[in-house]
């Protein structure tokens, strides 16, 4: 009797403590005539994640409640109050859970979840100002004036865009946003199936527009998906405008989400058939004019973009941009 009485007192104390903390208490069962229902409210802890130790379990009783009805209702029942479990991005089936988990990590902690170990940090990517030292193209009449500040915000990089550790990489997507060939397929495979799951909720994308998702297993924190025009042969004025809109829409999302660095692939120049040289002219004009328009805001600390990277994969495209960049971002 003494032991039973003592256990009852301990149980009552633990229940009272749980009530003071706003944690859910174990349901003792219905009173006579009551239906077997209970409120889903959880007091001050109602907003906590399902993986928080004080959140409800699938059975409707939180860790606090589970502690209170432990095998012997002793002080050791506090043990369940532990750190939330780490999300495994390779097996998780909940993109919302994974996205929330990644947002709570530091840059160093995110590295553990990258799909690759040979990722490229932003500081390892030279600016156009540095790259231009090895460019022998002479431009007598550049299209724009020399601007040292803007030359430090542009980079030309040849390599795998999926391995760049930047705030966002841009995906040359199709209208479904569910993955395809070329760089689109590479990005989806590297990021993992959760990227496709989130894209499925975006319900397609129009040509020239852009939408943003988490980067998941990519070194990039976000993926900006944009749909370029299909242009086989000489592009029309409307197709050129749509390609320009791809870059400007992506840059708008960059500002909206307060991101500081982004890498762009060659949009529409693959299976979409846009001529590489013509595309480069559209791209460089759009980037130069956008940077100039936002330059004053940057100086007022209203907008800070550290780097815009033109990421090419083919030697052909690298040569085109090396030849055209001095016309839009002169260094001499």
Language model features by range: what are they?
Residues 4, 70-152:
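An N-cap/entry alpha-helix motif that binds or orients negatively charged groups
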Residues 218-233:
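Short, basic/glycine-rich phosphate-binding loops at helix/coil junctions
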Residues 133, 197-221:
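N-terminal short beta-loop-beta anion/metal-coordinating cradle
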